[in-house]
């Protein structure tokens, strides 16, 4: 596993699960609307910079360097909160997005079109208009 030097708090670093390149996904979400904006990659140092500067820093897998969202485009991400998921392998960064989040110039990277999917419906909750049999009996009468 590739690990670049980092100033990340060791207690936070110990909670992270990384891929073979020392990276983990970071989901950027608009803090006030819940809109999912983009997914980038971070390593320990990118997370440290994100936590300590108030700006999202990512690791570019193609350029092999750190980049601060909006540094050249002006489409900045201002950090509102950062949370680690239950498995420790993904972070959710809630941001105030200024301008486009996507490199295409779109607000979000997730507007390239819906995929055909079967839409599921949850079952009707118990007690939603019909009487259920008593526990341990077969169709108990009222």
Curated annotation (Swiss-Prot):
Positions of Zn(2+) binding: 86, 102, 109
Top-rank EC class of the record's enzyme: hydrolase
Cofactor(s) this protein requires: Mg(2+); Zn(2+)
Region of interest called Disordered, as start-end residue ranges on this chain: 120-142
One Gene Ontology CC term in the entry: cytoplasm
Residues that bind Mg(2+): 85, 87, 89
Catalysed reaction, written as an equation: 1-(5-phospho-beta-D-ribosyl)-5'-AMP + H2O = 1-(5-phospho-beta-D-ribosyl)-5-[(5-phospho-beta-D-ribosylamino)methylideneamino]imidazole-4-carboxamide
Domain of life: Bacteria
Gene3D superfamilies: Phosphoribosyl-AMP cyclohydrolase
UniProt-recorded Gene Ontology molecular function terms: magnesium ion binding; phosphoribosyl-AMP cyclohydrolase activity; zinc ion binding
UniProt EC number: 3.5.4.19
Subcellular location(s) of the protein: Cytoplasm
Pathway the protein contributes to: Amino-acid biosynthesis; L-histidine biosynthesis; L-histidine from 5-phospho-alpha-D-ribose 1-diphosphate: step 3/9
Cofactor binding annotation: Binds 1 Mg(2+) ion per subunit. Binds 1 zinc ion per subunit.
Entry's Gene Ontology BP terms: L-histidine biosynthetic process
Keywords: Amino-acid biosynthesis, Cytoplasm, Histidine biosynthesis, Hydrolase, Magnesium, Metal-binding, Zinc
NCBIfam families reported in the protein's UniProt record: PRK00051.1
Quaternary organization: Homodimer.
Function comment: Catalyzes the hydrolysis of the adenine ring of phosphoribosyl-AMP.
Family (UniProt): Belongs to the PRA-CH family.
Protein name in UniProt: Phosphoribosyl-AMP cyclohydrolase
Gene assigned in the entry: hisI
């Amino acid at each position: 596993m590739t690990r670049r030097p980092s100033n990340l708090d060791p207690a936070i670093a110990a909670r992270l699960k990384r891929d073979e390149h020392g990276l983990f996904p970071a989901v950027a979400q608009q803090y006030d609307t819940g809109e999912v904006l983009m997914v980038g990659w971070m390593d320990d140092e990118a997370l440290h910079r994100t936590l300590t500067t108030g700006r999202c820093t990512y690791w570019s897998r193609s350029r092999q360097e750190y980049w601060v969202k909006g540094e050249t485009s002006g489409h900045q991400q201002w950090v509102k909160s950062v949370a680690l998921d239950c498995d420790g392998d993904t972070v959710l960064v809630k941001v105030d997005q200024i301008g486009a989040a996507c490199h295409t110039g779109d607000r979000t990277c997730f507007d390239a079109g819906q995929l055909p999917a079967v839409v599921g419906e949850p079952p009707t909750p118990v007690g939603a208009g019909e009487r259920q049999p008593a526990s341990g009996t077969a169709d108990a009468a009222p």
